[in-house]
């Protein structure tokens, strides 16, 4: 398979730059593989495609403000995009700068005196060390929500809420699990009223999700890694669904 096999025209005017007023107002494309048909619906119609025997599995990862701006000792500007936290004070990150910083270099975050130390580099990722009180606390005051590259606007206050699912709980993602963004509390309540079972897992979406495929032969593409956790209860319920021949969505 070649990368060119998947290329198609997508006019920029069709890429929404801001979310709809209500989550459920997003558009929904319904593909019927058996009938070979495509329908365009609203996400509020999603419930009509569910059955009481279904199991819905949601990703409860929570997006952190993972984009930072700073400068090197030389004065050069630096942009940091966290890939994933490896401890409370260390993280893998992508760095954009005119010249890549070397191990031992200090990056001072913009509008503060917060020093971030470069511990090392492996491929396109740098290992960074943040000072106390740790990455989460520093991100809350210094970081920005890392909007996808196809969003051609500056971050807004609304993004902290709308670029987050309503069931987000476990901090660690640098990008939202986008399919989950369209669910709101009333829809989740309606799912429960229909007797449809729900389960949770955690998969921290990494910055690699923004990286384009660099090779022409798709089979040679190296996928990035992401941290995940599947609770034993969720695994058991998924297995029970499969055993009974029921759907897991």
Segment roles from a protein language model:
Residues 1-249:
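Surface-exposed, charge/polar-rich loops and edge strands
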């Amino acid at each position: 398979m070649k990368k060119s096999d998947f290329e198609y025209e997508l006019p920029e005017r069709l890429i929404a730059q801001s979310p709809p007023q209500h989550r459920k107002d997003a558009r929904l494309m319904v593909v019927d593989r058996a009938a070979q048909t495509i329908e365009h619906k609203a996400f509020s119609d999603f419930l009509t495609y569910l059955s009481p025997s279904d199991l819905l599995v949601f990703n409860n990862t929570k997006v952190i403000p993972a984009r930072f701006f700073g400068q090197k000792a030389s004065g050069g500007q630096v942009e940091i995009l966290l890939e994933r936290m490896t401890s409370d004070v260390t993280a893998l990150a992508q760095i954009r700068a005119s010249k890549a910083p070397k191990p031992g270099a200090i990056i001072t975050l913009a509008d503060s005196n917060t020093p971030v130390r470069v511990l090392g580099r492996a491929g396109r990722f740098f290992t960074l060390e943040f000072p106390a009180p740790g990455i989460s606390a520093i991100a809350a005051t210094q970081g920005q929500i890392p909007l996808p590259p196809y969003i051609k606007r500056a971050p807004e206050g609304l993004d902290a809420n709308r670029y987050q699912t309503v069931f987000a709980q476990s901090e660690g993602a640098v990008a939202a699990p986008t399919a989950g963004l369209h669910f709101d509390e009333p829809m989740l309540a309606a799912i429960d009223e229909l007797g449809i079972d729900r389960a949770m897992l955690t998969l921290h979406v990494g910055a690699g999700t923004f990286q384009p495929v660099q090779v022409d032969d798709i089979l040679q593409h190296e996928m990035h890694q992401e941290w995940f956790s599947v609770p034993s209860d969720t695994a058991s319920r998924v297995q029970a669904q499969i055993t009974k021949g029921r759907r897991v969505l």
